[in-house]
Structures are given as C-alpha cells and as structure tokens.
Amino acid sequence: MADRIHWTVGQAQALFDKPLLELLFEAQTVHRQHFDPRQVQVSTLLSIKTGACPEDCKYCPQSPRYKTGLESERLMQVEQVLESARKAKANGSTRFCMGAAWKNPHERDMPYLQQMVQGVKAMGMETCMTLGTLDGTQAERLAEAGLDYYNHNLDTSPEFYGSIITTRSYQERLDTLDKVRDAGIKVCSGGIVGLGETVRDRAGLLVQLANLPKPPESVPINMLVKVKGTPLADNDDVDPFDFIRTIAVARIMMPSSYVRLSAGREQMNEQTQAMCFMAGANSIFYGCKLLTTPNPEEDKDLQLFRKLGLNPQQTATEHGDNQQQQVLAKQLLNADTAEFYNAAP
C-alpha cells in the first residue's frame, strides 16, 4: 500500500487552481482507480429530533436563536423511526442516517438510540447517526448496538470556523471524531461550501479531513441552503463550478473515501450534478428532505441515474434479519413522559 500524502494547504490550493477540465480528468482518473464509476451509494437522512438546538451555527434553522419559523419536535418514537427506515429501504436506500438537533445526547436518550440502530440493522441496512458531541462511553454503546457510521462535520477550515460557530470548538469536533474512530465506528465528516469562506478555507477544510489519522470513509460536501432568518440567509450564491472543483479536490485528496453530494442538491440542475459525479462524487442523500431543508424527490434522482447510466449501490446484507426484527418489535421503548425528549440544554 502506497504511503499516504500528508497534505498542506498550499498543495490543496494548487489543486483548486488547476484548469477545470484538467482537474476533472485527474479526479475521474483517481475515482476509477478506487471505485466502479457507475455505482452510487444511496443514503436516506431522517431528522429524529428537530429544532431547539442550543448551538449557534449561523447556517442552521434548528437553532432557536434565529427566527426561521421552524417548529421543534421531540425525539421520535423508535417504531416511527423504523417505519421510515422500511420506506427508505423500499425506495432503494442502503444506508439510513438519523440526525438529532442536540449539542450532545443525554444518558436518558441512549436506550432509544441503541434500539433505533439495532432495528435498522436488522433490516439489512447500514446505519449512521449524527447526534452532536459524543463521549467515549456513548460511542462504545452505539458501536455495540451496531452503528456503522457516525457523522460529525468539521464544516470549514479552523481559521474560518469561529466566524460561523462559537458554541462548540473545532477541537471538540476533532475529539468526537477520535472517540468515534476509537470505538470502531466508521467516520462520516465533511463541510459546507458557501458560508462566506475563501478558496483557501475550502482547501484548509479538506486538508483537515485528509490528514486525520485515517481519512473519513464518507465525506459529505454540502452547498449552503440559505434559510430566511439565519445570519447567512443573504450570502452570495455558490458558483456551480466552484462547488464542482471542491468535489474534485476532495476526490483526489481522499481517493478511497465516498464523496457525497449532500445538502443543496435541490438547487443544482442536472448538468451540475452530472459534473459532480464526473468529478468523483459517488454517494447521495435520497429523498424529499435533508433534516429541515429540501432535497430532490426520489423519482427525479432515479431519472437522472438513468440518463447518466448510474446504478444505486447494493449492500451485502440487503435482505435483513426477519427474526431479529420480530424480537426487537417486542422490546421497543416508548417515552416515559412528555418531557423525556426535550433537547439537551
């Protein structure tokens, strides 16, 4: 196995500065060396706990600091989550991601989260969660339940980060990724394009990700979805070619990682998405909503796949374990009280 490159910001920026077609050729070449270029991994993301998040991320409508009109919702019952997972699997998703608007999960939440993971795993789907900061014990408990991936984005470069978020440090995010990795869970971590960052900041984000002790298995690249009421609602639109460049550089710097088109696809036309796949994207979120912002409908995605000759990737455990599902159905936990599901303060 070839030695990994320890990337510098200068090296990453040099990739961004390449002529676009030359960059795309290099990215597609790298992509074909590590993946089947016709296969796209398909995930579905469900918000299992919406709003009332104590963080101040300037892009996010889930913070009560901003008047966005978003109504907060308590943690979903386990069976509700599993029903959504069944629908996602029927529609072609192979990974089910569950997101909660918390700074961190509390001890009282853990039994419910563990049952969600166990139930989705029993269907033969891969599991992913994004719950905020984790401690080592929480990561281990989720791993024991069978969690495959944990998402915790770095969002942007260390230098620009403080302009976007003040309630959680960059180091806290890196520490959570370390705890996830130590627990044996695969890492999903990426960032957002369009926060007001420079190209050097985009390079800095990708350097942070690529230089982790082990690069993330999954790297979601989001385009800012501007939500009225958030501080970034009036940001300039992202040039599609700048976004495509970011995908291409991510592919070159993290050749074995899945690079996912995440939030913002609703704003992209088919041509832009096609160029992202050419640049090395090989994973998407599939369905009508990403947490609280729009996403293309499933049938539009399938139509685009047919036009481009792409195929949804299948998993080895797609049939699931019916016996395990029946056992879990008898054990599902329900809320003890209405207050049980309040967001972590």
Curated annotation (Swiss-Prot):
Gene3D superfamilies: Aldolase class I (3.20.20.70)
Annotated metabolic or biological route of this protein: Cofactor biosynthesis; biotin biosynthesis; biotin from 7,8-diaminononanoate: step 2/2
Pfam families: BATS (PF06968), Radical_SAM (PF04055)
Binding-site residues for [2Fe-2S] cluster, renumbered to this chain: C97, C128, C188, R260
One Gene Ontology biological process: biotin biosynthetic process
EC number of this enzyme: 2.8.1.6
Oligomer and partners: Homodimer.
PANTHER family: BIOTIN SYNTHASE, BIOTIN SYNTHASE, MITOCHONDRIAL
Name of the protein in question: Biotin synthase
Gene assigned in the entry: bioB
